[in-house]
Amino acid sequence: MKDLLDIMRKKTDSDGHAPVEFDRIRIGLASPEMIKSWSHGEVKKPETINYRTFKPERDGLFCAKIFGPVKDYECLCGKYKRMKYKGVICEKCGVEVTTAKVRRERMGHIELASPVAHIWFLKSLPSRIGLLLDMTLRDIERVLYFESYVVTDPGMTPFEKYQLLNDEEYFTALEEHGDEFVAKMGAEAVQDLLKDIDLEAEISRLREEIPQTTSETKLKKASKRLKLMEAFKDSNNKPEWMVMNVLPVLPPDLRPLVPLEGGRFATSDLNDLYRRVINRNNRLKRLLDLAAPDIIVRNEKRMLQESVDALLDNGRRGRAITGSNKRPLKSLADMIKGKQGRFRQNLLGKRVDYSGRSVITVGPTLRLHQCGLPKKMALELFKPFIFAKLQASGQATTIKAAKKMVERETPEVWDVLASVIRQHPVMLNRAPTLHRLGLQAFEPILIEGKAIRLHPLVCAAFNADFDGDQMAVHVPLTLEAQLEARALMMSTNNILSPANGEPIIVPSQDVVLGLYYITRDAVNAKGEGMVFADTHEVNRALATGQVAIHARVKVRVHQTVINENGEREQQTIIVDTTPGRCLLWEVVPEGLSFDMINLEMTKKNISKLINSCYRKLGLKDTVIFADQLMYLGFRQATRSGVSVGMEDMLIPPTKHTIIDKAETEVREIEQQFEQGFVTAGERYNKVVDIWARTNDQVAKAMMDNLSYTLVKNKQGEDEKQKSFNSIYMMSDSGARGSAAQIRQLAGMRGLMAKPDGSIIETPIKANFREGLTVLQYFISTHGARKGLADTALKTANSGYLTRRLVDVAQDLVITEPDCGTRGGLVMTPFIQGGDVIEPLRDRVLGRVTAEDVRRASDDEVVLPRGTLIDEKIAAQLEEAGVDEVKVRSVIACESTFGVCAKCYGRDLARGHLVNPGESVGVMAAQSIGEPGTQLTMRTFHVGGAASRTSAANSVQVRNKGTVRFHNVKTVQHAKGHLVSVSRSGEIGIADELGRERERYKLPYGASILLKDGELVEAGGIVATWDPHTHPLVTEVAGKARFSQIADGVTATSKTDDATGMTTVEILPVTARPASGKDLRPAIVLDTTDGGEQFYFLPQNTIVTVRDGETIGVGDVIGRVPQESSRTRDITGGLPRVADLFEARKPKEHAILAEVSGIVSFGKETKGKNRLVITPDDGSEIYEELIPKWRQINVFEGEHVNRGETISDGPQNPHDILRLKGEVALTNYIVNEVQDVYRLQGVKINDKHIEVIVRQMLRKVDIIDGGDTSFIKGEQVDYIRVVQENQAVLAQNKFPAKFERQLMGITKASLSTDSFISAASFQETTRVLTEAAVTGKEDDLRGLKENVVVGRLIPAGTGLAYHLERRRQEAEAAEHALHNDFSEVDQAFSQALNSEQF
């Protein structure tokens, strides 16, 4: 404690000490001697201060003699006052004359009358004392709290060491053996036992024992003990120090006692806890002096132990000690842990001076790098600068005079303020700061009023709106801080989003609407067909009203474009355009072509425009352009006069016919259900499906009706043109509102979800314009309420996810240019169904190639290895028809600390290769966490309307191409078509270049109409299936024979009265009578060649064949109805992302084949099937027990590959890692996380997810230590193992064998090397206990640790400082070594010279 204090002393120390330079911090156990060396005296009395004089009592908890004077340079009795007596110790009161702040650092101690065990090492699991002594926690507690004796030295008696005796047994033994043996109780006994441990001997014994143990539990326990003992041995901690004889006392100013008015005192809880300890300790001393009866002394010792426990960690054992107001007292442990504890409240987050906050309003006239700062605030924030300036300019003689002037607000003060503020950036921050763009620098402009003015374009980055949001202003004081604020944090330098590299400074809402409005064209507007010489002429015509803003005209345009070689060339062209687009052209910078703006400026197009402006023309032009766009957009939106009226919500005339048709269909299904053709689940599914489809049809009719109007053109004919309906324009431009919202206004509200997520099958057929009935309104309140409740809960969850992500990735920084690895990920376009969701160019953009990229057709190298792929190269790759590229990835990076620039690739927020020192870990965490919060805050906007697509029932291709099968197994049906019998099959469609354009999942039992490699036209149907049932398909022909299908036992048969048809349905195991519980209903096919094939029927199967019927290949013998699907909302999303990053095993996860081989089924056990795989390579047979209710996808005799799915379900990431490797795991996690975000339309670069996955894969499990220093079963850093293995292999020894370990982010954060980082994250007590016992050293490599010790962080501009320090140390070490050598040389030469040969 005291040592830490010495370390933390800063340069200007009161006692003139030089600051201690340190590289690492070690934590350990304090010996009694050490505690005494910290102390300035013993606290003997429980008194605090005298209630009359308010002076501290002597030898009490606030004693001035021990802890130092209460007032600066003044002893307690007042004999010595002032500086001149500094260092004098008053002979009357014994107080040293010095500053009062020593009361914050001087410690005291309490000599305990009997030893006391430290509760952390006793109760924090696993109990360290218990592990060392190999006793159970229960037993140790019984000894400690004086319930039983423990034998510490058995002597020649039959007792064993560590044996427990109760009172009776002890007294009997005493009579029998006298003092031949020693048994004690209490902490003394434990201390003696700990002292007796011979670590060396125990370690060697355990090392011999471990290889011989066979039992798993014994092995685990032994290796745990071995680790702990080696830690004690290596760290120079002694086990007996876990029991304390001396208790340190915290300096009094850290546990203050403050007098309140009315003679009461407010005190820190620690004082109460210390008082308790001192009282009991003094009483115990007295009792021992009086030689009181044993039972009384014992009770007192127990109470002392309890009071020390409460002081260290109240509530850890038994009931927490409460104060006067029934509130548990806050102990030392509570002071450091939790959100309000020392770490998170004071070390990682501090309050900042020179800051203010106010409400924000919009500042449409500002430039992008400016913000409006109220004069009042500026005056307060820049006070010291103003004082200095007033003094320097001679307007004020002293600081005091300057202060007066500022208070009076004289006119010259405002002039000074204006000059001080010029070029001095301030930082604006909006809470919650979810990513780094939540804190940006601006140049302040002084304004009247009291609200901060914010530039509208940065609102997206801050996620700010002007409905009462507040923002904080911070002033960077030092020159370096101002420089960094300007160069790195200025809003103009943060145009791209770090999450996806797209512009984040993109106009929205009014601006988009304005730009969209002026760039629309209209048929037969005034002035159509006119020709203009240039844009100025267009302007004049517009101003005089000769031409309408939407008219189609011809204009001669001068444009400057940048050609292939990067040179600018002038062009003059005549274009068909509108006057509005010419207005826009006037603000477009030189270098962009006219065709980029000669279209309707929707939000997407504007974003593209700004993006290409940034890529082609650089930062400065883009910033100016963005501002001009904004001014133009606001102006034109005002002039457009777009507003919303009831008349704008056009209800499609065909709505009622569509709904009537749907109602007929629903009635038909109801009839089928009544006749027993469909099950209740199927009926529900089909009804919901019909309504989902109807909703889409109404929406489509509505959009068609809304989006086009018929107008007469110049020739007087009818022509369709896009509508100028206000609501449609808002939605079409991307300014506000979506098709889904308009659908609720003018189409039908559609299906609603219940609070549990299931869909109510009666939809709301009305829309908001028609109005809802009471019932409809009531149904829709479900969704709305769920939305609000979700929002409240999810915001907290999302914040917590971000915190965990930041914590796991905080120490990942770019540390070197290139690690030289050849590994990486193979990138392919991401195709789902008929859509290329993410083309290859987007996936490889900003990555570095890991190996030469070759053209598929002629194997020519298109791109050499190690190239950074930019937009131009990405486009070339597409043209060359490249289908996959292997790129470098952080997953494969081999840097020891952090990652290398080549593996990371482009810094998304800056658009070039990432700089050294960039903290990519935190960036990744923020990029993933930030949208999480956004999404959770936005759940309720669709009003809980169930967005469920109608189920797919066929593969219909969109492009002409060749059919490709991807691991599809098929059988040929008698009718000629193929039937799919594979589970994970996919069908791809490749174009003429061989690039895949579409990809579809193929369910089991689908009928495939084309063969592999056949041509298919656009719109052709390749496969069909029934989406609501899961068929059982035969793979051989033969005669069906029912096995164990007994009516009323394992099955039930229903006869339909209307048709006389009988169907057999298999009962679920739970619904069967006892006799049918263990039966396995199956259909056995007696094949033509005399064999038999078993088809086991899962529960609820509806059998579609009769006993004895002849069956062909590919026939359906039964179908299993599929259950309904729930609505997917980001509510499913956020917990899903958390589950993925926590690497949780899903419930009922997919079962994968552990080895490749032939499947067979062994003897069943109760409730489980035994699956046997006979491996191809002849190794031992693999068996697995699978619960009977699981549907098994493979049949007897089928061949499976390692990692293939045996039983469907959600994938278990641990299985993927074990069976398919880390690349497959990375792809799985990246795709799954991306699915959740993609569903919400959020773009995140894959890189960020990979960064987190790298951190989750940090550790490995050692399977066999080989010749390395690792023990079997140990968890070690992957990089460490790889390095040690290389070293061992170089000496021709055996390397360690290991298995990569996947850890959830919480666990990974806690298993970091830095104990400071782990302790400040979660489970502070556990982390610190473990670190202290093992004597851990923190090398202060991460960001968090350095923030805690108050240093620059080793990232960004702080990295240089750390590298320089390391360099100097290395130099000093080398220098010392060099000196040693020269001394040796000298000695040698002297010796040689003096020798007389």
UniProtKB/Swiss-Prot annotation:
Binds 1 Mg(2+) ion per subunit. Binds 2 Zn(2+) ions per subunit. InterPro entries: DNA-dir_RpoC_beta_prime, DNA-dir_RpoC_beta_prime_bact, RNA_pol_asu, RNA_pol_N, RNA_pol_Rpb1_1, RNA_pol_Rpb1_3, RNA_pol_Rpb1_3_sf, RNA_pol_Rpb1_4. It catalyses: RNA(n) + a ribonucleoside 5'-triphosphate = RNA(n+1) + diphosphate. Mg(2+) binds at D465, D467, D469. Keywords: DNA-directed RNA polymerase, Magnesium, Metal-binding, Nucleotidyltransferase, Transcription, Transferase, Zinc. GO terms for cellular component: DNA-directed RNA polymerase complex. This is DNA-directed RNA polymerase subunit beta'. The lineage of its organism: Bacteria, Pseudomonadati, Pseudomonadota, Gammaproteobacteria, Moraxellales. The gene is rpoC.
